[in-house]
């Protein structure tokens, strides 16, 4: 019995931590083609979302169950171990992506004793209905926006006229932003995502701060 417990725990750990070696697709040569020799991994993104959740809940005294939020954030990307990091621009519908993610997460969780809790957290996160899931979702999106600005400030983003292979530019929404005067990669990230945070002041303020300030500290 004890051996089975250890086996289940180690299987989950060894599978889930493969995210350390999965690169965030949005930064690859088919998307923003970040010029840094080392590109952010999915695990680093997950870590960033957790730090962001701790920081914002602390400074703004946000009424959420932080432990629940952190579990959601840790769990929500582990499907990418099996299916990779699928972006909104990768020719797959949101419904298809969600189904693939759910199947992958269930497979990775396996027979952990907390299987039911973890699957429930995954579903709650995806529905974006509870205060914890909305907060976690906003942390997930904002962390990516911040990373885009970090790359911008470090000089790792290419100019907008060097994006001939970027699938993001096939989006009519992105083309409209270019027509309206977007000058940098982060301009597009900012305009694309800012509406997500409408009415959620800590996130509105955080995104604006990142936009207006250099992230090099």
For the regions a language model picked out, list residue spans one by one.
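Alpha-helical, largely C-terminal catalytic domains
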Residues: 1-217
